[in-house]
Structure formats: structure tokens, C-alpha cells
């Protein structure tokens, strides 16, 4: 069993759903559901990183560990770097980053991504699932990932990759409908969970943001831009919806109300 620390960034001032870490789901704040899933993963330590006193109080009330961070970070990775520095986490320690809006994340994939990092000797590891619906393929909020034959990432994009020249031309001409598109096993959706060594997180934030990450608004592209490898494997369990919008929140509430 691989030892790892989970850090959960929980930003209070979400643009689409302000205050969402404290949104009530089945009688508990959302961040507590994420915390409980992380604890079930076998992590040796779980830390919530937040810039908000109310979130801090909620987590501590449930016996969780909190690290207060600046409200001025531009990304979740910058928040992680502050936690690593503040808590003096050793450079070789494995950090798993779980988003604070994933109350339904399966614990098994949290440990899986840590194992993936160790198994392939890379600086960063993540997970993906197969895309079976054409609507998801063309949805820019569903990030696509393209890998080589061994699972090393070639690129992440909000666009459909690889681009099926002939089939997509038929789509544009009206000869083919989206629902008739044969997706086979060519398309993968990236899951926003990462594992890295603490020292690599500190290295990452020293790099200047890349043109590609700014165009796509995907911070993981910075890693590829600077020549580092990311390994992705298929998740052992497909995670349910995360909470980005009020509609997502209602879906999650409906799911957890049955438990």
C-alpha cells in the first residue's frame, strides 16, 4: 500500500456557485462529504486547504485538519504549493489533489492515482474514463485527454481529440448525426484528480504559465509544455457528477438523499 497525503482545495468564492464548500447535502456541508471519501481511500493524512474561516470551522467541527491559505491564488495547484510549504511536507511525499466539489468521488480511485504515480515513475499521474456519448465529446467542459500506447499524455483539450477528419466532415455537412457517431475506444475524458510528489508541486509553481494552458484554460498543460511526463490510466470506478452549478448540486443532493 502506497503512503500518500490528500490535499483538498476548497475555495469559497466560486464564480458559478459561491459558497459551495458549505452547501448542504444530506445534512452535511459538501466539503465534509469530500473529506469522508478521502479518509476512506487509505490516505495517511487528509488536509483541507481553504481561504475561508467558515469552511475552516466546518471542517474542524468534523475533526478534520485545515490549512488556511491566501485568497489570491490563481489556481488550485498554487494553493497546494502553499500548503506544502506551510506544513513542511517532505519533497518525496506523494500528494493527491482532490477537488473540493467532488462529494461522490470513489475512494478507490484516490488510492489508484497514487499507485499510478509510483508504478510509472513520473512526476504527475491522473485518471480518465472512456467517452460513450457524443454530446460529452463535444462538450468543452468535459476535458479530453490523448495518450500514447503506454498511457503517457500527449495532450489535453476541451476540443474533441483525436479529430476524426472524415466522420466530423460528415457531421458538418449533415450527412451524419451526432448520435450516430462511432466513438469506439478512441476518446477519453480526463478526471480532475492528480498525484505528484510535493517537490514537483513546488517546481510547477516556479514555471511561467504556458501559452497552451492559457488558451485552453487547463493548468495541467504547463507540465507538458515544460517537457515533463504525465501518466493516465483508466479509473477503476467511474465517478459521478461533480458540483459546478446549482443544477449539479441538486443532482448530487438527490443521489445522496437515497443513502
Swiss-Prot record:
Q: What is this protein called?
A: 3-deoxy-manno-octulosonate cytidylyltransferase
Q: What class of enzyme is it?
A: transferase
InterPro entries reported for this sequence: Cytidylyl_trans, KdsB, Nucleotide-diphossugar_trans
Q: Has UniProt tagged this entry with the keyword Nucleotidyltransferase?
A: yes
SUPFAM superfamilies reported for this sequence:
Nucleotide-diphospho-sugar transferases
Fetch the CDD domains from UniProt: CMP-KDO-Synthetase
Which keywords label this protein?
A: Cytoplasm, Lipopolysaccharide biosynthesis, Nucleotidyltransferase, Transferase
Q: Which GO terms describe its biological process?
A: CMP-keto-3-deoxy-D-manno-octulosonic acid biosynthetic process; lipopolysaccharide biosynthetic process
**Pfam families in the cross-refs:** CTP_transf_3
Q: Which HAMAP family match?
A: KdsB
Where is it mostly found?
Answer: cytoplasm
Q: In which pathway does it act?
A: Nucleotide-sugar biosynthesis; CMP-3-deoxy-D-manno-octulosonate biosynthesis; CMP-3-deoxy-D-manno-octulosonate from 3-deoxy-D-manno-octulosonate and CTP: step 1/1; Bacterial outer membrane biogenesis; lipopolysaccharide biosynthesis
Annotated family: Belongs to the KdsB family.
- What GO terms fall under cellular component here? cytosol
Q: Does the keyword Nucleotidyltransferase apply?
A: yes
Q: What GO molecular function terms would the record report?
A: 3-deoxy-manno-octulosonate cytidylyltransferase activity
Name its cellular compartments: Cytoplasm
The function of this protein is: Activates KDO (a required 8-carbon sugar) for incorporation into bacterial lipopolysaccharide in Gram-negative bacteria.
Amino acid at each position: 500500500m502506497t503512503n500518500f497525503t490528500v490535499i483538498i482545495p476548497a475555495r469559497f468564492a466560486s464564480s458559478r456557485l459561491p459558497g459551495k464548500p458549505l452547501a448542504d447535502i444530506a445534512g452535511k456541508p459538501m466539503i465534509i462529504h469530500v473529506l469522508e471519501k478521502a479518509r476512506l481511500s487509505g490516505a495517511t493524512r487528509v488536509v483541507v486547504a481553504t481561504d475561508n474561516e467558515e469552511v475552516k470551522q466546518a471542517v474542524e467541527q468534523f475533526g478534520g485538519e485545515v490549512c488556511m491559505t491566501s485568497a489570491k491564488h490563481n489556481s488550485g495547484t498554487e494553493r497546494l504549493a502553499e500548503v506544502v510549504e506551510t506544513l513542511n511536507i517532505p519533497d518525496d511525499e506523494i500528494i493527491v489533489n482532490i477537488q473540493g466539489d467532488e462529494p461522490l468521488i470513489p475512494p478507490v480511485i484516490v488510492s489508484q492515482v497514487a499507485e499510478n504515480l509510483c508504478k510509472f515513475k513520473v512526476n504527475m499521474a491522473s485518471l480518465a474514463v472512456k467517452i460513450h456519448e457524443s454530446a460529452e465529446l463535444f462538450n468543452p467542459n468535459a476535458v479530453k485527454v490523448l495518450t500514447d500506447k503506454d498511457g503517457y499524455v500527449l495532450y489535453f483539450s476541451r476540443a474533441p481529440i483525436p479529430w476524426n477528419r472524415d466522420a466530423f466532415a460528415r457531421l458538418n455537412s449533415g450527412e451524419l448525426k451526432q448520435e450516430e457517431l462511432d466513438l469506439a475506444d478512441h476518446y477519453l475524458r480526463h478526471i480532475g484528480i492528480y498525484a505528484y510528489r510535493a517537490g514537483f508541486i513546488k517546481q510547477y509553481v516556479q514555471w511561467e504559465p504556458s501559452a497552451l494552458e492559457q488558451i485552453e484554460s487547463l493548468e495541467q498543460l504547463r507540465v507538458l509544455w515544460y517537457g515533463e511526463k504525465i501518466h493516465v490510466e483508466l479509473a477503476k470506478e467511474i465517478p459521478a457528477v461533480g458540483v459546478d452549478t446549482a443544477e449539479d448540486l441538486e443532482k448530487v443532493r438527490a443521489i445522496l438523499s437515497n443513502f
